[in-house]
Regions:
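Generic alpha-helix detector with strongest preference for long hydrophobic helices that associate
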Residues: 29-36, 45, 49-52, 56-59, ...
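Short hydrophobic membrane-inserting helices
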Residues: 1-59, 63-66
Length: 287
């Protein structure tokens, strides 16, 4: 479009130069005009006006096209603004409801947790204790977890560690007698809403997911991490869709390494560029 605009301006300039050149020569040098008239006959005026007319007509067509294109662009921008406004109205309403959902989750854990956890943060701290106890008492589980420390972990060992850790979370929740499953479902739906609404627009997805992430404590992010790899993180088709959403969009990138049960667990989310990774570790993050 910029090229067409430049062409139009150049043609206007050329037509103007032709017109003023003829006027200037007519006034300054009658002999030159006489020679031109001898060559072109009596039609020099028609020739010049016809040439200028064609140029200006072409220029007018270009400007009409540019005007139409500008109107289309303005119309698209207006639609995009309306689209974003509608989305943000729904999104921020859902985000405000999230606080109520989290509060209800804390109440449920406080009421039913057998370890006496008063909220989700304490529920996660108890899970860390449960993990350490299992590491110390179950050699097979300890071996599976230690495999994650290997630089080039085999696929079979990776899958075993992922399965065993997810199973451990399931066992912990069962032992506690509560999970606040509605909290995880709500977070899942909120994240899914953003991803599906802005499909293919990574920057927009990242912007709005950051709004959600910023409202969560480290312990909540930790619960999302391990809940997503457990049986409770599967969808109706037994697929780990929630984990995929979290990993593909680096939702957990700002979780601290101290929050994870083990630093090596970052390998369970191979596409996430965690903030605590060193330069060598960042090089192997899958895109």
């Amino acid at each position: 479009m910029k090229t067409l605009k430049y062409v139009a301006y150049i043609l206007v300039f050329v037509a103007t130069c032709l017109l003023f050149s003829y006027i200037f020569i007519s006034v300054v040098d009658e002999e030159v005009i006489s020679k031109i008239e001898d060559n072109l006959g009596d039609n020099i005026g028609d020739f010049l006006s016809g040439t200028v007319g064609i140029v200006l007509a072409f220029v007018s067509t270009i400007f009409l096209f540019l005007t139409f294109n500008a109107q289309q662009k303005q119309s698209k921008e207006a639609k995009d603004d309306a689209f974003r406004t509608r989305f943000e109205g729904t999104f921020f309403n859902m985000l405000s409801m999230y606080y109520n959902v989290r509060s209800e989750g804390d109440k449920q854990i406080c009421q039913f947790s057998k370890s006496g956890s008063k909220n989700m943060s304490e529920f996660y701290v108890r899970f860390k204790d449960y993990y350490l106890e299992t590491i110390g008492s179950n050699n097979d589980f300890a071996m599976a977890m230690n495999a994650l420390d290997e630089n080039d972990i085999l696929e079979t060992k990776y899958k075993t560690a992922l399965h065993d850790l997810g199973k451990l979370y399931d066992e912990y929740v069962k032992e506690q007698g509560c999970n606040a499953g509605f909290y995880f479902r709500y977070v899942h739906n909120l994240i899914s809403f953003v991803i599906k609404h802005w499909e293919g627009k990574k920057d927009d997805i990242h912007t709005y997911l950051n709004f959600i992430q910023s409202e969560m404590s480290d312990e909540e992010l930790g619960l999302l991490f391990y809940n997503s790899i457990s049986n409770m993180g599967q969808d109706k088709n037994h697929q780990y869709r929630f984990k995929q959403y979290l990993d593909d969009n680096s939702f957990l990138e700002n979780i601290s390494e101290q929050t994870l049960l083990s630093r090596a667990h970052y390998k369970l989310f191979p596409k996430t560029n965690f903030s605590f990774l060193n330069d060598d570790e960042r090089k192997i993050v899958k895109k």
